[in-house]
């Protein structure tokens, strides 16, 4: 029975419509009053807004229950600039605006609507109705479309009504999807029912729409920033409907919509629409509304007009409809002529010039091909150069199919010069209307004759084609909610680009093809690019470019990019550059934690140090990034980095990555500078260098907003070869002799290779493959490439070098030039447009652009006369740029909106002269001339503006907008007024206006500023001259240097023989003064108008060995400001360094080992300040104690290594006596107070009464870690101490250190060490092999033209002493230890130590020599051989027991015939030179236990095991003997050991070795007795010592011994 009842009710529900559908009764004429208001302005109270009001009477006639007819009558418009009010202002309070009869008739055309469940289902318009008119009528119909019943299935409805009879009378709230004028979106209903009155409220959720008539252009350059999207929504629409029904009849309907533009979360612009529909009367129909029979359409805003315009822009005359054909050509030409005449009226560019450019762009976008041809023939041809250039650039900026085709035609006809054509193609790259036809036109042009004949044009065309294709296929679609299938288009263009790649014959052409693919950002290109990357037959620059071509896919398919690049990064078979670039690209895909864990794992076990170093730096910098778009990645990187035990090695030349993020706190704006440099062992030049700028403004992320990069392959080898060709040709006889000697040396090395069956390692590169390029990237698009290949270099050499002689005539012809130039350039730095509908049926357009015009004209001359090169440039540059950010409504009826305008103008006429001459002295003269009677101007203007334009569009004339600047008091308070005029060196400088004092992006958009700086020269030309003169090195006497006083102790009284030290010092100085000295003078003179001068002269006097130097500085300057006398500075600095000790014993016995410094300085004008500083660079007590403990009998390398450490100077003592002016003293006091405040927690001070005008300073660097500094300063009134201030690791000078050149070699080179039977290779592989009395080849240049070889053998069986033989070119050097002294033979003849330098041999200490190689050096002390080569030396062309120096530790064992083996015995035997002079010791060679390769994670402690030394000395010695480029994966550290008890704390008196706390464990330990001293736990000294002991070692020699305890001390550690 129940089911029958339910079925009956369902039938009734279907038969009858709900009550609200009968709002309009049939045959009744309803008259509603419609009022619409548009407000545009700033979101601030009491500011003026542009307001336009639309009023009409709406007639609605219900044809039947489901159809109505609607017509607008009595239409009126009014508009004014008024403050905002809550109610719609009356028509009388606003200025009346007349509508043309054509527009009125259009608006009066009727429409027919079908209602379904209260909603407008379909619309029919008159066939003559225009799109803009239809949309305005949609806005009216939209106000009567509502359905207050919640959607649910029929059974639920009936059961609900069956249970609750009065359900319809209750208040309800629900969500549903509904079509409105603004789209198909989720809406929220609230229904409140009162007695006879029902109030219905409806709001729209724009985040949940399936369809919206939204269009966007120019957004393809931004990258995704997920972290920014939630808080930085640029445009936020809000719409609320309110319906009031009485007795089921619609009495009133109101719609309010608010659209705001937000920057950094703050509203900066708004547009508001208000619509109200009020029932005035209803009566029976007296006159019927005409029936319409147009096509059925939806209520959603129609963007057909926008689509027609877009189709015209993209396809030109081939479009189906010409939307601008009603705009007559003669009126366009008249407007263009008017604009060009206005531009010509002003000599220089002004902000209006950029506005004129924007107007030209708008006009050109409406033109057809025939119209452009007419404009060209009528206006362009007759215009001057500036107007022609502006018109060309305006056509390129317009970026429509017609304008682009017009430009390409004229480039093909060679009407535009190639350089200008390339600039225009760069502008075309940024067209906001990319299309298939434009891309095809560019590709066709790139294959044309003109392009093939000019590489600059061809390059620009292909890059532009790629960028346009990106715009076509980019996922950031023109219509965001519409997804089109573009696979066919992608495949088509990919085939074109890949065919270009396949047809390429040179490296440059292949790279150009790949850059075109990269600019296109085709996701389907990943597989082809991957094939190129992994194909080792391809040249390395091509494979690297293939990786770079994946950059635009980081947002669309990050996982796919990671899937391609992660295996490449982890595969050690690939080249290091490829792996590092793969990692770099992969990191920009913002990888997840699971992937980063794999990267860190690979880093920890990485054998290539360049790859490991770059990986660590990259992850570390990403972890510290403050870029809001990388916050998730930063957190993950921090996490994975905290768990790694990898410690990067210290290298001077290593691949590196750095970031400099500059972001505003709590805002999503800022910039980030990225820097990446990739080095490789086979090149002394950088392999890759990238510097980029990322910009984030209000959450809009422009990745690679600008980038410049350099990449090269084998170019260093080719450059080296080319430079050799440029060397001067020596005399014929010398050349012949030298050539014979070199050939003899090469023959000697080749004979050695023949004896040992060494196969030459040919270079793995072809000179013709050498390639380098510099590229420029803008907005993530490759913009320009400058290739450098062998052909270019050879052409230059052929042109300027002939028969080995420089062709000076060609060089003079190149350098003697004189030109006049005039250039003009125009561009949009960006243009972005977004359009979406409003509830008034009007399109709202939010756009931004920066039209910029730059001009420069002048003369340029370059001349070479004898030894003088002269450059003169006279230029008059001017630039004008305007940033326009606007929000506007546009219809033919009117145009209204709000915009923020920022304009910059600069005009700076200038003349520059530069002269470089080399006569008696080297001289550079640089002169800047400000012309007379000319004014340089730099101005800045910002203002928010509201505007109105009636009508909005005219076919016959340009309608000027009614603008009004909005002044907001709260923003004007953030500016300051400036008005100042002063005279500077004869120039009148004027600054006037107001400028912001709080700089944020929103302040720049909303505040009114008008600031100008002008510089005027009213008299003769003002010349500013800088003259730098570098004098020749002259001989001089050193007796003029007086230095007899040594530094006296100030802080400590130490028992030492002061008299003997003074005598030693005086004797040393007198000895130096007897030698020949050298003097050089460098002067700099600055001259300015009004007889202003400044002279600086620096005189340097030094002895030949630079042991004693004196610098004198004298500066004279004309008086300025309130000075009445000449300002002068006279300073003299004298430095004397001690003699360089050659052994530890000599260091210990040397009375004077300090560096003496003396500075006297006087400066000032009327009042003089004087300072005298005596300083001494010396050793602290701790360092001296360390040196005394080292005083043992060492020889050879161990002695020298310890000597370097023992001779370090780690303390500076200085005494300054001064007489300062009060102002100077106050400034210095403020700075000192600032230092004390900054180090508040580490500084202590106490008052003292010391000598006046005297300061004593002591600075001590902790000598072990070199990361902590103690500073003590004693002033006349106090004593200040700063303890344990942490600083970056400090380099401590050593008086025993060799030259800077050798220091750099040690820090940056590759080292191989041979000791006993143990070898550590160049690539840090440690293994044992038995050395015999037969020569073994340690290292050799195994190229086809070898330069050196190093061999070694034992002097006797079971002896640790060795003999070394070095074959270096034409020389054979043999050395061995005899009677505790190294004996050397060169070509079989003994040489004395004083003759070493003539043979490029140096003696270190008493038994250590250094033999220089063509690249690098060999050190030998009789027991150990240390071969050191530059890190880039002979990669894969070295052979011998030291390996191949290729930075890979997995492929060390290549035999002499270049075959890889795992058998160390086989490897060793291949490099064994057997002859009758030696016994092969076959038993030792065959014993397998004599061969062993150590695990790379272990640290072998067998090196330099001297039992008689202290543990600390041994540990430091061992670490120094380690190859400095190894990772030091295991290490021992010295610390003071602490033992804690209940009431006391005990400290070890001497440091105790232990493993590093994290990641290491002891593998071998020994017992050691250690002395301890104890202190009460509660004592302050105990707490202080605990703190110091945790940071390093503590000196406790003067404390009482409490007990001796046996502890376990590690001998070696291993990373676990």
Curated annotation (Swiss-Prot):
PROSITE patterns: VITELLOGENIN (PS51211), VWFD (PS51233). It comes from the Eukaryota. Residues 1505-1531 are annotated as: Disordered. SUPFAM superfamilies: Lipovitellin-phosvitin complex, beta-sheet shell regions, Lipovitellin-phosvitin complex, superhelical domain. Pfam families: Vit_open_b-sht, Vitellogenin_N, VWD. Expressed in the intestine of adult hermaphrodites. Transmembrane segments: none annotated. Residues 24-689 form the Vitellogenin domain. Residues 1505-1514 have a biased composition (Acidic residues). Disruption phenotype: Simultaneous RNAi-mediated knockdown of vitellogenins vit-1, vit-2, vit-3, vit-4 and vit-5 increases life span, causes accumulation of neutral lipid and an increase in lgg-1 foci in the proximal intestine; however, does not affect fertility or pharyngeal pumping rates. Expression of transcription factors pha-4 and daf-16 are increased. Disulfide bonds join 1312-1442, 1334-1478. Glycans are attached at residue 1270. One of its GO terms (molecular function) is nutrient reservoir activity. Residues 1-19 form the signal peptide. InterPro entries: Lipid_transp_b-sht_shell, Lipovitellin_superhlx_dom, Vitellinogen_b-sht_N, Vitellinogen_open_b-sht, Vitellogenin/Apolipophorin, Vitellogenin_N, VWF_type-D. Gene3D superfamilies: Lipovitellin, beta-sheet shell regions, chain A, Lipovitellin-phosvitin complex, chain A, domain 4, Vitellinogen, superhelical. GO terms for cellular component: extracellular region. It is found in: Secreted. Residues 1310-1479 form the VWFD domain. Keywords: Disulfide bond, Glycoprotein, Secreted, Signal, Storage protein. Precursor of the egg-yolk proteins that are sources of nutrients during embryonic development. Together with other vitellogenins, may play a role in modulating life-span, acting via induction of autophagy and lysosomal lipolysis. This is Vitellogenin-1.
């Amino acid at each position: 029975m129940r089911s029958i009842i339910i079925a009956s009710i369902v039938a009734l529900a279907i038969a009858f419509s709900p009550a609200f559908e009968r709002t309009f009764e049939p045959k009744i004429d309803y008259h509603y009053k419609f009022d619409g208001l548009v407000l545009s302005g700033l979101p601030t109270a009491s500011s003026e807004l542009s307001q336009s009001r639309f009023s009409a009477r709406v007639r609605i006639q219900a044809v039947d229950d489901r159809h109505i007819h609607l017509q607008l009558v009595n239409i009126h418009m009014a508009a004014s600039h008024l403050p905002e009010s809550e109610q719609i202002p009356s028509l009388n309070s606003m200025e009346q605006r007349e509508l043309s009869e054509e527009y009125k008739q259009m608006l009066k055309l009727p429409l027919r609507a079908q209602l379904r469940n209260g909603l407008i289902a379909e619309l029919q318009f008159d066939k003559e109705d225009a799109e803009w008119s239809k949309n305005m009528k949609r806005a009216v119909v939209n106000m009567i479309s509502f359905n207050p019943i919640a959607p649910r299935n029929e059974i639920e409805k009936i059961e609900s009504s069956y249970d609750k009879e009065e359900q319809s009378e209750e208040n309800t709230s629900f969500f549903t999807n509904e079509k409105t004028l603004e789209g198909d979106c989720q809406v929220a209903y609230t229904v409140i029912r009162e007695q006879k009155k029902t109030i219905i409220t409806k709001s729209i959720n724009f985040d949940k729409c399936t369809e919206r008539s939204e269009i966007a252009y120019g957004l393809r350059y931004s990258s995704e920033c997920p972290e920014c999207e939630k808080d930085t929504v640029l445009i936020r629409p809000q719409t609320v409907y309110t319906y009031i029904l009485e007795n089921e009849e619609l009495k009133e309907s109101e719609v309010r919509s608010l659209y705001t533009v937000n920057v950094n979360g703050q509203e900066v612009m708004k547009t508001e629409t208000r619509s109200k529909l009020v029932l005035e009367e209803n009566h029976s129909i007296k006159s019927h509304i005409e029936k319409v029979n147009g096509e059925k359409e939806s209520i959603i805003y129609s963007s057909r007009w926008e689509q027609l315009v877009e189709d015209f822009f993209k396809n030109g005359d081939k479009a189906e409809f010409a939307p601008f054909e009603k705009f007559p050509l003669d009126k366009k030409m008249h407007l263009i002529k008017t604009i060009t005449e206005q531009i010509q009226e002003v000599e220089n560019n002004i902000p209006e010039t950029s506005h004129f450019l924007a107007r030209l762009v708008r006009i050109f976008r409406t033109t057809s091909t025939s119209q452009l041809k007419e404009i060209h023939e009528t206006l362009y041809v007759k215009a001057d150069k500036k107007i022609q250039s502006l018109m060309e650039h305006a056509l390129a900026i317009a970026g429509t199919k017609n304008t682009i085709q017009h430009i390409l035609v004229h480039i093909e006809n060679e009407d535009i010069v190639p350089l200008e054509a390339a600039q225009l193609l760069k502008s075309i790259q940024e067209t906001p209307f990319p299309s298939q036809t434009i891309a095809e036109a560019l590709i066709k042009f790139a294959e044309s004759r003109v392009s093939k004949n000019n590489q600059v044009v061809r390059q620009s065309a292909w890059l532009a084609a790629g960028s346009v294709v990106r715009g076509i296929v980019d996922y950031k679609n023109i219509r965001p909610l519409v997804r089109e299938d573009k696979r066919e288009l992608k495949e088509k263009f990919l085939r074109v680009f890949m065919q270009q790649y396949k047809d390429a014959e040179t490296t440059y052409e292949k790279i150009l093809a790949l850059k075109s693919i990269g600019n296109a950002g085709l996701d389907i290109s990943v597989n082809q690019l991957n094939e190129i990357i992994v194909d080792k037959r391809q040249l390395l620059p091509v494979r690297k470019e293939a990786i770079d071509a994946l950059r635009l896919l980081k947002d669309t398919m990050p996982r796919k990019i990671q899937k391609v690049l992660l295996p490449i990064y982890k595969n050690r078979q690939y080249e290091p550059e490829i792996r590092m670039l793969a990692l770099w690209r992969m990191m920009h895909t913002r990888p997840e934690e699971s992937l980063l864990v794999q990267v860190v794992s690979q880093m920890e076990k990485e054998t290539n140090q360049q790859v490991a170093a770059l990986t660590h730096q990259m992850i570390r910098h990403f972890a510290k990034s403050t870029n809001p778009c990388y916050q998730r990645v930063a957190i993950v990187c921090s996490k994975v980095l905290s768990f790694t035990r990898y410690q990067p090695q210290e290298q001077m030349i290593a691949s590196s990555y750095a970031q400099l993020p500059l972001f505003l706190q709590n805002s999503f704006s800022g910039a980030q500078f990225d820097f990446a440099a990739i080095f490789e062992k086979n090149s002394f030049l950088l392999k890759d260098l990238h510097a980029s700028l990322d910009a984030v403004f209000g959450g809009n992320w422009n990745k690679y907003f600008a980038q410049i990069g350099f990449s090269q392959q084998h170019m260093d080898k080719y450059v080296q070869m080319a430079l050799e060709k440029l060397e001067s040709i020596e005399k014929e006889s010398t050349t012949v002799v030298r050539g014979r000697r070199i050939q003899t040396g090469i023959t000697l090395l080749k004979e050695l290779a023949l004896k040992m069956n060494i196969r030459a390692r040919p270079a793995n590169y072809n000179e013709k493959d050498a390639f380098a390029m510099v590229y420029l990237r803008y907005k993530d698009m490759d913009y320009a490439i400058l290739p450098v290949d062998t052909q270019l270099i050879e052409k230059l050499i052929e042109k300027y070098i002939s028969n080995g002689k420089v062709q000076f005539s060609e060089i003079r012809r190149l350098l003697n030039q004189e030109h006049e130039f005039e250039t003009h350039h125009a561009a949009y730095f960006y243009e972005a447009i977004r359009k979406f509908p409003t509830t008034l049926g009007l399109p709202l357009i939010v756009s931004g652009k920066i039209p910029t015009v730059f001009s420069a004209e002048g003369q340029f001359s370059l001349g070479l006369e004898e030894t003088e090169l002269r450059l003169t440039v006279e230029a008059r540059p001017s630039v004008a740029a305007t940033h326009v950010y606007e929000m506007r409504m546009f219809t033919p009826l009117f145009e209204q909106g709000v915009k923020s305008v920022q304009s910059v103008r600069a005009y700076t006429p200038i003349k520059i002269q530069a002269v470089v001459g080399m006569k008696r002295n080297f001289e550079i003269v640089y002169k800047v001339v400000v012309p007379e009677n000319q004014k340089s101007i730099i101005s800045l203007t910002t203002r928010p503006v509201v505007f109105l334009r009636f009508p909005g569009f005219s076919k016959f004339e340009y309608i000027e907008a009614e603008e009004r600047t909005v002044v907001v008091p709260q923003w004007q308070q953030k500016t300051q007024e400036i008005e100042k005029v002063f005279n500077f060196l004869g120039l009148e400088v004027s600054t006037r206006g107001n400028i912001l004092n709080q700089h944020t992006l929103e302040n720049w958009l909303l505040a009114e500023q008008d600031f100008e700086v002008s510089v005027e020269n009213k008299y003769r030309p003002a010349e500013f001259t800088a003259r730098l003169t570098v004098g020749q090195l002259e001989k001089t006497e050193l007796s003029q240097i007086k230095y007899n006083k040594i530094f006296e102790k100030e802080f400590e009284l130490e028992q030492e023989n002061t008299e003997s030290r003074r005598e030693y010092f005086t004797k040393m100085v007198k000895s130096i003064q007897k030698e020949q000295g050298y003097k050089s003078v460098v002067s700099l003179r600055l001259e300015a108008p009004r007889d202003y001068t400044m002279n600086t002269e620096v005189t340097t006097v030094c002895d030949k060995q630079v042991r004693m130097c004196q610098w004198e500085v004298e500066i004279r300057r004309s008086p300025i400001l309130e000075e009445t006398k000449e300002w002068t500075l006279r300073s003299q600095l004298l430095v004397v360094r001690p003699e360089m000790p050659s052994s530890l014993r000599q260091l210990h016995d040397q009375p004077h080992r300090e560096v003496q410094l003396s500075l006297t300085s006087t400066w000032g004008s009327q009042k003089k300040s004087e300072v005298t500083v005596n300083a001494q660079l010396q050793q602290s007590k701790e360092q001296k104690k360390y040196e005394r403990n080292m005083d043992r009998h060492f020889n050879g390398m161990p002695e020298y290594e310890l000597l370097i450490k023992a001779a370090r100077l780690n303390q500076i003592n200085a005494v300054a006596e001064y007489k300062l002016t009060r102002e100077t003293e106050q400034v210095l006091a403020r700075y000192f107070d600032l230092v004390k405040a900054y180090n508040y927690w580490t500084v202590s001070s106490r008052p003292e009464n010391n000598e006046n005008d005297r300061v004593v300073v002591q600075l001590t660097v902790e000598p072990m870690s070199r990361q902590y500094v103690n500073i003590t300063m004693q002033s006349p009134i106090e004593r200040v101490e700063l303890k344990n201030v942490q600083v970056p690791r400090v380099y401590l000078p050593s008086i025993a250190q060799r030259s800077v050149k050798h220091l750099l070699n040690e820090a940056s080179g590759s080292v191989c060490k041979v000791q006993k039977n143990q070898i550590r290779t160049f690539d840090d592989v440690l293994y044992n092999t038995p050395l015999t009395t037969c020569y073994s080849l340690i290292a050799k240049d195994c190229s086809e033209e070898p330069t050196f070889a190093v061999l070694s053998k034992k002097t006797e069986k079971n002896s640790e002493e060795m003999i070394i033989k070095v074959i270096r070119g034409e020389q054979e050097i043999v050395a061995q230890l005899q009677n505790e002294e190294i004996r050397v033979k060169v070509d079989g003849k003994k040489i004395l130590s004083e003759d070493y330098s003539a043979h490029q041999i140096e003696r270190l200490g008493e038994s250590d020599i250094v033999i220089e190689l063509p690249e690098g050096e060999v050190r030998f002390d009789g027991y150990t051989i240390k071969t050191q080569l530059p890190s880039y030396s002979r990669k894969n062309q070295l052979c011998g027991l030291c390996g191949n120096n290729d930075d890979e530790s997995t492929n060390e064992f290549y035999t002499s015939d270049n075959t890889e083996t795992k058998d160390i015995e086989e490897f060793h035997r291949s490099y064994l030179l057997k002859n009758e002079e030696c016994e092969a010791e076959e038993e030792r060679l065959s014993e397998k236990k004599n061969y062993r390769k150590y695990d790379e994670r272990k640290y072998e402690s067998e090196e330099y095991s001297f039992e008689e030394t202290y543990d600390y000395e041994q540990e430091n010695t061992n670490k120094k003997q380690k190859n400095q480029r190894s990772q030091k994966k295991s290490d021992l550290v010295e610390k003071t050991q602490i033992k804690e008890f209940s009431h006391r704390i005990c400290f070890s008196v001497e440091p105790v070795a232990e493993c590093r706390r994290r990641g290491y464990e002891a593998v071998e330990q020994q017992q050691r007795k250690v002395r301890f001293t104890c202190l009460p736990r509660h004592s302050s000294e105990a707490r202080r010592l605990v703190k110091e002991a945790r940071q390093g070692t503590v000196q406790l020699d003067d404390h009482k011994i409490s007990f001796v305890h046996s502890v376990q001390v590690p001998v070696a550690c291993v990373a676990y």
